[in-house]
Amino acid sequence: MNNLRELRKENGFNQEQMAAELGVSLSMYQKVEQGNAKAGRKFMEKIKQRFPKASIDYIFFCKQ
């Protein structure tokens, strides 16, 4: 499990918007958000650019 869904919703994005902004398919984005696929380095970097105040550990590993 990760905090990606929570972060996305807090910032007013839907899954389609996030997938488009990250340059991935909706299906891939959904799998990562649901914890059914691991995020690659580029995916993590793009998320960090979109949400610079959140740490990678918080977003993907639920660590403060």
Please report, for each region that a protein language model flagged, where it lies by residue.
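Residues in the helix-turn-helix
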Residues: 17, 28, 58
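Recognition helix of helix-turn-helix/homeodomain-like DNA-binding domains
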Residues: 23-38
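Short amphipathic recognition helices of helix-turn-helix/homeodomain-type DNA-binding modules
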Residues: 58-64
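DNA major-groove recognition helix of helix-turn-helix/homeodomain DNA-binding modules
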Residues: 42-58
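Short basic helix-loop element that most often maps to the first helix and adjoining turn
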Residues: 2-17, 21, 46
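Conserved functional loop/turn residues at catalytic and ligand-binding sites
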Residues: 12, 17, 33-36, 63
